Regions:
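Conserved flavin/dinucleotide-binding core of flavoenzymes
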Residues: 9, 44, 50-218
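Glycine-rich loop(s) and the adjacent beta-strand/alpha-helix scaffold that form part
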Residues: 1-62
Length: 218
């Protein structure tokens, strides 16, 4: 394949391997941003009467294994309709970002990733059943009776890294690793959320627009 230009729109940490000719300072900058490990879990339950009895929709649990438990947000598409009666089955959404408190954020993410990759499904299931029982039992929830299915989605390289003033230097704008890392190299430009040091769609669109324009003449 031949082209007049190329946009590398992948994870920052992969780019030095795809283009080893980059300057060392740029490769170092591309390796700086460490993605946040995440676990998003869906739990199918027979009904959500326990939530109704307790008068809750979401529970935040700082310090617990799962940091948040909530009823899935209602989505109506085509002929599909979200459950409206507490007697109907529904999905719960559980989230976790494994970390190691006390360390710099980037090191916490690395340790959290290792934990995530070495955790068995049996451990996730046990933690789910235990926390849901402690959270919802006062509303009549019984994990042995009410849990129908569990799906664990592990993202070892989850959200893009965002600078944290507790751990990262207060760089001038042009010296931030994401800015150094996205510099054009010949006919190669770089676009991804890492280039904006964030994790969201609007940033990806903005960075794609910038990278394409860097390739255009004039």
């Amino acid at each position: 394949m031949r082209a007049k230009g190329c946009v590398l729109a992948c994870w920052n940490m992969m780019i030095p391997y795809l283009c080893p000719e980059l300057p060392e300072a740029q490769k170092e900058a591309l390796h700086y941003l460490v993605k946040v490990p995440l676990v998003y879990t869906s739990v199918g339950i027979r009904n959500w009467t326990s939530f109704q009895k307790l008068g809750i929709q979401r529970v935040s649990s700082p310090g617990s294994y799962w940091s948040a438990v909530s009823l899935n947000s209602p989505v109506n598409m085509g002929e599909y309709r979200s459950p409206t009666s507490p007697e109907e089955p529904i999905l719960l959404h559980l989230s976790r970002s494994p970390c190691k408190p006390g360390l710099p954020a980037r090191e916490q993410h690395k340790i959290g990733r290792y934990e995530l990759l070495t955790t068995t499904f049996e451990t996730f299931e046990r933690k789910i059943r235990d926390q849901l029982a402690r959270t919802l039992s006062a509303g009549g929830f019984d994990p042995a009776r009410d849990i129908e299915a569990i799906t664990v989605n592990r993202w070892p390289h989850g959200y893009g890294y965002e600078y944290n003033p507790l751990f990262d230097p207060d760089w001038p704008e042009d010296q931030r690793p994401n800015v150094i890392g996205r510099k054009p190299f010949g006919k190669i430009t770089i676009a991804n959320t890492d280039s904006a040091a964030t994790a969201y769609t609007d940033a990806a669109i903005d960075q794609a627009y910038r990278a394409v324009n860097e390739l255009l003449p004039g």
